[in-house]
Amino acid sequence: MNKSIAPAPVVAAGDVKFGNSLPLSVIAGPCQLESRAHALEVASALKEIATRLGIGLVYKTSFDKANRTSAASARGIGLDAALAIFAEIRDSVGLPVLTDVHEAEQCARAAEAVDILQIPAFLCRQTDLLLAAAATGRIVNVKKGQFLAPWDMGNVVAKITTAGNQKVLVTERGASFGYNTLVSDMRALPIMARTTGAPVIFDATHSVQQPGGKGTSSGGEREFVPVLARAAVAVGVAGVFIETHPDPDHAPSDGPNMVPLRDFEALLRTLMEFDALAKKRPGAGTI
């Protein structure tokens, strides 16, 4: 273990750069990896949008949804089937890829085909998982637990950096507030930037999730995704995390809080304008 290693202020996944003072980048894709054809369809559409807008984009999808509300809910195609699809998205579509890992043993295998390993919020304090992810040398994106204060993420980041990996992102996704409800405290964004030194991501879609809100599955209020995303980008963040799907009402997981793919480009255009104003780059003031 190393001592007093600061996280990198700018983290690059291929050509996509995340930095709190850099132009906004985005992490986007469907909640669950449903099939090769579906993944390539969505990844190709997102690549076209990102190229048209000139914004950095990392493709996100999960090979296993290990924390579903009900044991009967669809979990995904599994790591074995997902690896070749992840590699194809990177090589053929040309997008960096992010996926969740839930167990230490998954990290090295997933790292063979993805650029960013994501630690789910419920697991953000699991030391062995964090150390295994750090050991791969890949970027590690840690979602802040709904039960943590933003300044508590300093200890989480330190577990990764003292293991020798400075490539860390921290993601805000709301805090538990009573039953089946999350709230987003925008103060958490600059606090996490200050106390961790890492690039900060705002998860706009999971922040409107209603955990367990539909009894055997989670609910969500997708109409508030643009509201919270605009607020976070106005504060100033390195990136936004937005789950999107061609038909979210029939998606196997997280449909109620995913943005329809047809609405994705317009939302990004707005967020880029807010970002330019927040960071006072040329072109700011066009909102």
From Swiss-Prot:
Keyword list, A-Z: Cytoplasm, Lipopolysaccharide biosynthesis, Transferase
InterPro entries on file: Aldolase_TIM, DAHP1/KDSA, KDO8P_synthase
Phosphoprotein is among the record's keywords: no
Uppermost EC category: transferase
Coiled coil regions, renumbered to chain: none
Major location category of this protein: cytoplasm
Gene Ontology annotations for the cellular component aspect, listed alphabetically: cytoplasm
GO molecular function, one term: 3-deoxy-8-phosphooctulonate synthase activity
Alphabetical list of HAMAP family matching this protein: KDO8P_synth
The protein's name in its UniProt record: 2-dehydro-3-deoxyphosphooctonate aldolase
